[in-house]
């Protein structure tokens, strides 16, 4: 079976481990770039899905949506600075996700939503705990669409001090391995249900 991972740098960090863990069970592919915010997803999703047949699509958007930017969207801005704003406000995020879900459902693949991992204090260009609101919005979309959730946020939180870099949304190599264990097990579970 063919599995597609869609996500940002967090998914880039766990892809190789997931591929290794699912060796012999699934061929694990990942989009060729950082998925960025949902707005970027909407621009590129058709190209990422291509004409291939996917059995499972494990997807996340969030950390780039809840990022603060100013004039230059490629740079993070201080959330408290005048003129800084969320890259994708919450209501738009929810709407964009619903649209992305429709486009992915059209492939006939089994979809798995991976929720957004924790934003710690002192993380550049983001507000601590903002992932909670975004995950709640995403949960509404996924519940309505009947899509299961890989609760990577709770998994990360269980060992956050050990696995996440200080004041940073990213993880250590062993931290990515820890995330990969959860991702691989959720994908394996869903492959057996197909």
Task: Please place each PLM-identified region on the residue numbering.
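Catalytic nucleophile-elbow at a beta strand-turn-alpha helix junction centered on a G-D-S/GDSL motif
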Residues: 1-16, 37, 64-66
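Alpha-helical cap/lid subdomain in secreted, periplasmic
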Residues: 20-27, 39-193
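Short beta->alpha junction loops
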Residues: 30-37
